[in-house]
């Protein structure tokens, strides 16, 4: 479970935030962003020593000042249910389009330089611009352009 998905789910729930400087903030999470900046409402701020309290209607806390967050257990359970549900909805890896050809060895030869004489070459020559047996003798190049 990722911290940001936990915070997104915790919107509207009460939480405790402790900052690196020791202050704590108790309030209801309104919003959070990708930098873990959070917006709380109905906040009670407690000083580092725990002897001073402030009540604020709302506050904004910068994400890099946060030491830890205490989130209700119901939110954690909800996030775990959502992640397990989304994992069960996914296809297993390697199923569907885009995971290789799947028919290697069933068709003769491919295209390009790596093709040999006997495995799918039309008139020999091994591909565009290559001489060789049955090719254009001493003429270099692919037969296009000047020269």
Curated annotation (Swiss-Prot):
Lineage top rank: taxon: Eukaryota
One example of a Gene Ontology biological process annotation: spliceosomal snRNP assembly
Compositionally biased spans, kind Gly residues: 122-147
One Pfam match: LSM
InterPro entries, per database record: Lsm4 (IPR034101), LSm4/Sm_D1/D3 (IPR027141), LSM_dom_sf (IPR010920), Sm (IPR047575), Sm_dom_euk/arc (IPR001163)
Subcellular localization, as worded in the UniProt entry: Nucleus
Keyword Mitochondrion applies: no
Sorted UniProt keywords: mRNA processing, mRNA splicing, Nucleus, Ribonucleoprotein, RNA-binding, Spliceosome
Subunit record text: LSm subunits form a heteromer with a doughnut shape.
Function according to Swiss-Prot or TrEMBL: Binds specifically to the 3'-terminal U-tract of U6 snRNA.
Protein name: Probable U6 snRNA-associated Sm-like protein LSm4
Organism in which the protein naturally occurs: Oryza sativa subsp. japonica
């Amino acid at each position: 479970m990722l911290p940001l998905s936990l915070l997104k789910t915790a919107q509207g729930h009460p939480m405790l935030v402790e900052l690196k400087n020791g202050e704590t903030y108790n309030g209801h999470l309104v919003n959070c962003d990708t930098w873990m900046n959070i917006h709380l409402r109905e906040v009670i701020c407690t000083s580092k020593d725990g002897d001073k309290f402030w009540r604020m209607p709302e506050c904004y806390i910068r994400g890099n000042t946060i030491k830890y967050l205490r989130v209700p257990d119901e939110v954690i359970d909800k996030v775990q249910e959502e992640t397990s549900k989304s994992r069960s909805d996914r296809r297993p890896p390697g199923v569907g389009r885009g995971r290789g050809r799947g028919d290697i060895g069933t068709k003769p030869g491919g295209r390009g330089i790596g093709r040999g004489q006997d495995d799918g070459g039309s008139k020999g020559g091994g591909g565009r611009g290559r001489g060789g047996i049955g090719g254009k003798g001493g003429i270099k190049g692919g037969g296009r352009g000047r020269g």
